Amino acid sequence: GSGRTDAGVHALAQVAHGDVPESIGMSGEAWANALNACLPLTIRVTQAEEVHPQFHARFDASGKVYRYRIWRPRMLSPFEADRAWHLYGPLDVDALRWCCEKLVGTHNFIRLSANRGDMPEVERRTLPEKTTRTIHSAEVRECGEVLELEFEGDGFLYKMVRLIVGSMIHVARGREPREWFASLLSDPNGKQSNQTA
């Protein structure tokens, strides 16, 4: 696929590729139907088509978008149970918007990501190119009962969005000043954020 998703994350428009011998001779629609017959109902192939042999879903992705949904009323709707984070209580939405403004650009996200274990920690700490990513846009939207945080970037590190959102909420609840969040982006040598959404 074009990327991994953390546990509990839903993917929309996820692109994947596979190498299939031409001798099979199935149309894209036939492939989609065959795959859907084998997949659980929570996963659907909406389109399948032939692509250039050199195409790679992950390396040819032009960008990725994460949308984090926060349900704010006292009682969580059963329809939102595995689709939103339930956070009842006051949140400073202006602080969330301020954090979003700080996110846009290219930053070293070492303090806002986790080590999956696929690279030594010393490498993560000494090679900033391994943990530097570009965020093209970051927005806060109030959609009725739901607050949506949306991030578009060239790619995301392991648990990066969960740590960004958790840290933003920490500021929006008044538990840390806004400058703390800014320092997570500007000072790669500081303490790792442990505020996971």
Map each language-model feature to its residues.
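Structured-RNA-binding interfaces characteristic of tRNA pseudouridine synthases
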Residues: 1-197
